[in-house]
Amino acid sequence: MAKRPLGLGKQKQNKKTKVESSSGEVSRESTPVASQIEVELADDVDADDELVQLKGLWQTYFDSDRDSEYVLNGIVHECDRLLREADKEGKIKELSDVFHAIYALALSELTIFKAGEEEDEKKKKEEIAQFFDNALERCSLGESDCGKSDLLDLVKAKVIIQRVPLEHMSALTVSSKSGLNLNTLVEDAKKHFKVSTKDLSLVYEVLEMFDDLLDITENFGHEEQIAEGLDSDDEEDLEPIQLDKKHPVYEMQQNLASNYKWLKEQLIALLGQLNKKDHAKLYHLTAKKIGELYLKDAEEPTNVYLSLAYDDDESKQSSKDCKESQASALKLVQNAIDYLDKAQIEDEPETWAQVAEAYIDLGNLHDNESSEQEKAYQTAETLLTKANTATHGKYDDILENLKQ
C-alpha cells in the first residue's frame, strides 16, 4: 500500500470563500487541501486516477472512527470539482455509479454532524432534510447517467434507513400524530436493498443500521429510561408503549416481527457471499448478528415453555403447548449456536463465552437432568472455563452458577 496526498488541492480559490453546489453551501475553511490528507492506495491501481483517489479517501473515512466532518467536506468538494470538470468536458455521463454513490454517501453522513450543530430545532431539521434530499437526488441522477445500479439502490436504502430515525423519529413523542407514515419509508428502503457484491462492507452497514432502527422502534418512548443506564435484563423487561394507530411509528411497531425476519434473511444471504478467509472480520460480525437474532427469536417460545413447564396446570392443552414451545425454542437456539460458533475468533474469549451462554440456554430448554441437558451444560462449562482462564476470572460468576 502506498500513501499519497489526494488531488483535492486543484481548487485554486481563496480558502475563505464559499462555493454553492448541489450539496448546499459549505465553507472552504472546513475543507482539506491536498497536503493535509493522505490515504492508502493499493499498489495495483493507477494512483493518478482521480476516481481511484476519491475511492481511497472515502474508504479511509469509512474504515475510520468517522469523527471528521473535515474529511467528509473534502469528499463532497472533490465530488463537486470532478462534476464541474466533467460538465465542462461534456463527460458527465462517463462518471461511474461508484462516483455517484460516494457523493451520496458523503452527503448522508454529513447529517450526523449537522444534527449536533444547530440549536434552532426547526432550522436543524430543515438542514438535515436538505442533505438527505440531495443524497437521494444524487442517487437518482447517477441512475439517470449510468443506468440501473445495485450499488446506487443500496445507497438509497442506506440513506432512507438513516433518515427515518435521525430526521423523523428524533422529533416525535409518544403523543405525536403527524400525517407521515414512517413504515412507508421503511418498506421503500427494503425495496431498494440488495446484497450487492460490489460493496459487501456497505451491505453489512446498511443491515446493521436497519437492526438499530428496529431496536429504536421497539424501545420507542423508553429513551430516557435507557439513557439513565438500565442494565440489559431491565431493558429486556421494558413493555412496548401502546401507540395510537395514527402515530407515525405505530405501523413500524406492528411490523417488527416481519422486519426482524427480513433482516435475518438478508444477513444469511450476505454471509453466503463472504469468504471467511478473505473477509474474516465481516464474516464474524455477520455470523454473530445472525446468531443473536436467532436467540431473540427464541425468547418468546422459551418464556412460554418455562412458564408452562413449571406450572401446576396439567391439562392436555397445556402439555401440548409446552412441548410445541420447547421444540420451537430448541430449534431456534440450536440455529443460534451454529452461527455463533462460526463467529468465534481464536484470540477473542468473549466470542467463546457467547457460544457458552447459548449452550446454557439450550440446556435450560432440555428436559431436566436429561442426557441432552447435561451435554449442553458440559459444553458450556468447557468453553467458559477456557474463556475464564484467558480473561483472568471474568466469567467466575457464570461458571459458579453453572456448577451449582
From Swiss-Prot:
GO terms for biological process: positive regulation of SREBP signaling pathway; regulation of translation; translational termination. Its main location: nucleus. It holds the Pfam family Nro1. It is found in: Nucleus. Residues 1-34 are annotated as: Disordered. Coiled coil: none annotated. Keywords: Nucleus, Transcription, Transcription regulation, Translation regulation. One of its GO terms (cellular component) is nucleus. Belongs to the ETT1 family. Required for correct translation termination and probably involved in regulation of hypoxic gene expression. This is Enhancer of translation termination 1. It comes from Candida glabrata (strain ATCC 2001 / BCRC 20586 / JCM 3761 / NBRC 0622 / NRRL Y-65 / CBS 138) (Yeast).
